[in-house]
């Protein structure tokens, strides 16, 4: 298989494993276990002396195809597909830590990710320090002799802050810590954390990789040594494996990832520019705009903008609700990366469990709204916003 294939080709052909029947579409191997020709063959398989599958909780041919395709796209040596994005995040963090270890995490995280490092990890004796990840000095100040993991997402959910991944990786390497990056918002098409120095990348495949709101899934990607030493046993014994059916569904979704993301990004950029000109909008945050606070870092580490737009309405929560309720094409939903345009009010949905103070620190105000642009006609989406804004009180 050619390593020179470009992403669009990798996503259609990468990792394909055909049976003796020569099917054009990847097969779904819906089986719990696998048969061995002899007892000796079973023994050798379990000893690791021969390659092959043992049990679907450990891996399956369908999952293997999906993992290999993700590795090609990300530039990773190895990967494990998980039942959800949160299963991937939890596995990537907990599999390499023990009681007494310390995590430094950017405070701007998806609500459930923040719960894992701030609430779950301490139950196992793992300390966590949350920082404003935009300033590299904060990462350095938070380091202790027990620091083993740096965790961040970039761009962040929902306010699209950007963190200097290469800078964080440099600090981590100085102390032998690992950098885990949640790359969901950038997608592997616009940002490759491993090339920037990160050690582990996680995705919620539920989002852009599926792209059509059908199934849950996640992926952890890293070098083979790290996977073997940290994730292998955790994966076998705790059971976060993706189902073969979901792996097959994601194989179908990922084929069109470049086409969808291209249209979604074009829509997001044009909608961001439109919203920036509206009097009822206090501010717009979009990684493709020159007025983004971290535009210099974006130019250095990202090759494209985003399918997401964050904006703040002057009228606060009432204005946000009025806008969302008046939209016709764009649907209210907390999901993202879908072919359909989706909108949500983070303060009352994805980040509702944070205190008012914590939300304010993240830049989430009562008027903050997050748009996940879909693949619809751009003009229809802008007209939908124009109509809805007309129903928002000044």
How would you label these PLM feature ranges?
Residues 118, 127-129, 145, 325, ...:
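PLP-dependent enzyme catalytic core of the Aspartate aminotransferase-like
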Residues 2, 8-17, 78-280, 285, ...:
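Conserved PLP-enzyme active-site core in the AAT-like
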Residues 2-60, 68:
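N-terminal "arm"/small-domain region of PLP-dependent enzymes with the aminotransferase-like
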Residues 10-29, 318-358:
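C-terminal core of ALDH-fold dehydrogenases
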Residues 38-87, 112-119:
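Conserved N-terminal alpha-helix of the aminotransferase class I/II PLP-enzyme fold
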Residues 269-337, 354-360:
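Conserved small-domain helix->loop->beta segment predominantly found in fold-type I
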Residues 238-239, 326-337, 388-394:
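A common structural junction motif
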């Amino acid at each position: 298989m050619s390593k020179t294939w470009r992403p669009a080709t990798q996503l259609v052909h990468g990792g394909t494993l055909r049976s003796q029947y020569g099917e054009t579409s990847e097969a779904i191997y819906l089986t719990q276990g696998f048969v061995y020709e002899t007892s000796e063959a079973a023994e050798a398989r379990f000893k690791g002396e021969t390659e092959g599958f043992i049990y679907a909780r450990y891996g399956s041919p369908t999952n293997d195809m999906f993992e290999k395709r993700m590795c090609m796209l990300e530039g990773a040596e190895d990967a494990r597909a998980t039942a959800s994005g949160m299963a991937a995040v939890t596995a990537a963090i907990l599999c390499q830590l023990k009681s007494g270890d310390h995590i430094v995490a950017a405070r701007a995280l998806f609500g459930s990710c923040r719960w894992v490092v701030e609430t779950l990890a301490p139950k196992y004796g793992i300390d966590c320090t949350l920082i404003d990840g935009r300033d590299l000095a904060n990462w350095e100040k938070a380091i202790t002799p027990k620091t083993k993991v740096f965790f961040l997402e970039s761009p962040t959910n929902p306010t699209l802050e950007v963190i200097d991944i290469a800078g964080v990786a440099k600090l981590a390497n100085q102390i032998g810590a690992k950098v885990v990056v949640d790359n969901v918002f950038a997608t592997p098409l616009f940002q490759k954390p491993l090339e920037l120095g990160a050690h582990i990348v996680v995705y919620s495949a539920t989002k852009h990789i599926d792209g059509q709101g059908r199934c849950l899934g996640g992926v952890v990607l890293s070098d083979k040594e790290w996977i073997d030493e940290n994730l292998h046993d955790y994966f076998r014994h705790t059971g976060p494996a993706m189902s073969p059916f979901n792996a097959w569904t994601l194989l179908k979704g990922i084929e069109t990832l470049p086409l969808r993301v291209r249209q979604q990004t074009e829509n997001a950029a044009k909608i961001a520019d439109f919203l920036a000109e509206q009097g009822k909008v206090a501010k717009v945050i979009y990684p493709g705009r020159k007025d983004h606070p971290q535009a210099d870092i974006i130019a250095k580490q990202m090759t494209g903008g985003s399918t997401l737009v964050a904006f703040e309405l002057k009228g606060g929560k009432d204005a946000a609700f009025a806008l969302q309720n008046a939209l016709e094409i764009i649907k209210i939903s907390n999901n993202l990366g879908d072919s359909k345009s989706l909108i949500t009010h983070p303060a009352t949905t994805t980040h509702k469990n944070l205190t008012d103070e914590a939300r304010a620190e993240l830049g989430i105000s009562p008027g903050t709204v997050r748009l996940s642009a879909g693949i619809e006609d751009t003009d229809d989406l802008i007209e939908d916003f124009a109509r809805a804004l007309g129903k928002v009180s000044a």
